[in-house]
Amino acid sequence: ITVGKTLAPIVETTIPFDVVSQKYKPSKKYEYGKGTWSWIIGMDWSCNFDEQKRYIDFAAAMGYQTVLVDALWDTQIGYPKMEELAKYGKSKGVDLFLWYNSNGCWNDAPQGPRGIMDNTLKRREAMAWMQKNGIRGIKVDFFGGDKQEMMKLYEDILIDANDYGIEVIFHGCT
């Protein structure tokens, strides 16, 4: 148990790294860096090609390394335009993170992409596409609790992402 008069001892603790053996070897050095995203201000309507391009320009001007393209990019931007957006970002020194719905029987949230992260074959296919197109990472959202099945999904996503050198943000989770 870690306690303190402030959050510092909890946030700064190294106990997990001191007592748990590393189970997997990282495929690369993962460094998130600074980033921005449009959803915090514009929500779903902001997930379009032109707005994301403006955010890439903003990130480049600020010296940020990433832009998170949030929910609905698969339908409001589409895969071909996302490839174009990723190339544009690279030309500005900015990498992209893409939002994904975790899906499964626990999740009926309509935002997409859906039906990918809970399916090993589709997930690995998507990650191969991301790797090919220089996508830096994913934000996976709407997890359904903290049962063993969900913990296994976290681990499966992390294992596959590591195989493809994809960084991961878990959101809406334990």
Describe the role of every protein-language-model region.
Residues 71-174:
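Aromatic- and carboxylate-enriched substrate-binding clefts and catalytic-loop regions
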Residues 1-97, 103:
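Conserved structural scaffold segments of CAZyme catalytic domains across common CAZy folds
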